[in-house]
Amino acid sequence: MRCNACWRDLEGRAISTTCGHLLCTEDASKILSNDGACPICDQVLSKSLMKPVDINPNEEWINMAMAGISPQILMKSAYRSVMFYIAQRDLEMQYKMNRVVAQCRQKCEGMQAKFSEKMEQVHTAYQKMGKRCQMMEQEVENLTKDKQELQEKFSEKSRQKRKLDEMYDQLRSEYESVKRTAIQPANNFYPRHQEPDFFSNPAVNMMENRETIRKDRSFFSPATPGPKDEIWPARQNSSNSGPFDISTDSPAIPSDLGNRRAGRGHPVYGGGGTANPQSTLRNLILSPIKRSQLSRSRPQLFTL
């Protein structure tokens, strides 16, 4: 058995009440001293409503208590005793259940407090994220506007660049046309002809192309008014037009060459002075060949 107030195991003597509850001596004295009520059914208790009982009676008390009592009374007493025991077990089970429920309620309250705190944190975080999403949406809108403005500026700059490229191409074409126009008169005024190469093989090219050069009159300057002499005068047998001067390793200059130069206003070789350097160079190159033909009668001075 257990005390219905403190639920401690009862040993020895206990106090039973008329309301069918069992108390320990300490709790019963507290109730009587304070004029309190039963802790189970809240019935006001007094000393007359309480009776001390022996929890573990001896054999002698059992034999003396049952003596002289009719079986009907014994059966009725046994029934009440059994019902009291069942009531005590029910109270004990209820106490245990209440205790478990209290523990579970305490745990649930703790968990509810934790979950409430978590929910508050989640709600706060949700509000922060909502504000941040609004800020991000505003920022995206601003960036979209900036992007549109930059696209418009880029399109304008691209259009200006294309226009500048077109202007540059036009100016370049005009510059090229002006350049070609400026170079064209010079090419027309000084016509160029394909001249023979005198220096690749002089001994062969000069002899082969001599007649061609003589026939090509485009190398000569315009004719000078007045009498003309031959470019290559005929050979004279006078003593003044002597042979080549071997001592000086150069051909002798004819004596009448100076008189002819002084008496005429145009050069000996038919050119116009320094006006036509190509004709002068050609005459200077061909003059030894002509003189060598005129002096074939001279013996060979050098032999290979």
UniProtKB/Swiss-Prot annotation:
Disruption phenotype: Normal vegetative growth but fertility defects leading to reduced seed number per silique, due to abortion of male and female gametophytes characterized by abnormal tetrahedral structure becoming either asymmetric tetrads or polyads containing more than four products, because of impaired class I crossover (CO) formation during meiosis.
Gene Ontology terms for molecular function: transferase activity; zinc ion binding
Any coiled-coil regions, as ranges: 124-184
Top-rank lineage group of the source organism: Eukaryota
Gene3D superfamilies for this protein: arf6 gtpase in complex with a specific effector, jip4, Zinc/RING finger domain, C3HC4 (zinc finger)
Region (Disordered): 218-279
Function of the protein: Ubiquitin E3 ligase required for class I crossover (CO) formation during meiosis.
Name the UniProt record assigns to this protein: E3 ubiquitin-protein ligase CCNB1IP1 homolog
